[in-house]
Amino acid sequence: TFTDVTAEAGIYSSDIAFGLGVAVSDLNGDNLPDLYISNDFWERDYLYINKGNGKFSEELPSRVNYCSTSSMGADIADLNNDGYPEVFTTDMLPGDNYRLQTTMAFDPYHLEDAKYRANYHYQITQNCLHLNDGTANFSEVGLMCGVAATDWSWGALIFDFENDGNKDIFVSNGILKDIMSMDFHDFIADQVRIRTPGSKHRFDYLKFISNIPTEHLQNYAFSNAGNLKFSNRATSLGLSQLSYSNGAAYGDLDNDGDEDLVVNNINEKCFLYRN
């Protein structure tokens, strides 16, 4: 039997939050599980520190210098083997210049400043890797570590898929309808917005949606070489099939001592990878 204690525990139930991920771990070494919530769109992420009395305190602005703008997946694990867990979140920054130029639009400075002053905190469109200093205060090092840009990313998994003692990062990618396509916005959506107000005919949304481009993307498998140095080994590991991947999970499915991987795909069969 369960009782809903969300409000009394200090957990937000915001009408504007698009919560897509949650990760649980003891971030500050007090033997109490803390929570990290990844929120899509304009709402910032939430970091809840467990106070040990059934209460949580949301402290992201004072502990994280900035977070992903459109956070989707999230996971927590110790990536540098210092005993303190890091936080990793996924976003939508493309990893190549072509996709960067044709799919991304960034907010102007005055809008970013307005969001910050309205308590949305500093946000950046990239995967974020928050390095823990041992007291649950974090420095964002995603770009430095080479894990910031994986395109339209969903699932985030941190686990040792190489069995070398260093935890690695798996990111699932893909978007069935690439609504960020600048060509779609400039040459199709804008024309529809111009014509629709004067039209006396019923608008065909299904036809409109069919014009949105689809984008199969490669999943990423970042090998951890130690000292927070990562490289994408998806191709050499057999994990680079183009897909519309979102959810993913790992586990030793054949009891051979290493972790296998299951990846869900939209409108396509899932992937089952034996390690």
Predicted regions and their residues:
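Acidic, glycine/proline-rich Ca2+-coordinating loop motifs
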Residues: T1-N275
